[in-house]
Amino acid sequence: MRSFLTVFLTLSLIFAISCALKQKEIDPWLNTISGGKPPEIDITGKWYDTQGSGFFTWGEGYLRQEQNKITGTIGDYNIKGVVSGKIVCLVFLSRNTVYYTARLEMFQDLLSGNYFKATNKEQKRGYPTSFTKTVDPTKK
């Protein structure tokens, strides 16, 4: 029974890893999931997780948008993404491994939506998350 359990757990882990979004799949996946509309927003700037503190927070983020492409960091994760209309689709990477994806929508200075485990390529049943943009006091 013990060996069966070990084999089952090992195969489950291999299956979960093989189903996750891979580094080479990011660009095609982002283009497919985003919808391909021209960007209506620019999310370049400094962002904060609205949860602030607690068990799980993303932390501070710095995003740069060029046309519809997004790069940057949020907390310990490197970010790659696209903007389609007012929708933002992000991939959270660390050491070339995809851990999470997110689908967010811009409402004034708030990005709000859901994040998903990398194994959830269809982005169903996500976890709520949101980020608020920091106002640069020198630009007032």
Where are these regions (language model features)?
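Amphipathic/hydrophobic helical signal segments and adjacent flexible N-terminal regions
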Residues: 2-46, 52, 130-140
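Extended, hydrophobic interaction surfaces within ordered domains
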Residues: 19-20, 111-115
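Central antiparallel beta-sheet cores of small beta-barrel/beta-sandwich binding domains
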Residues: 29-107, 114-115, 125
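Short acidic/polar inter-strand loop motif in beta-rich domains
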Residues: 121
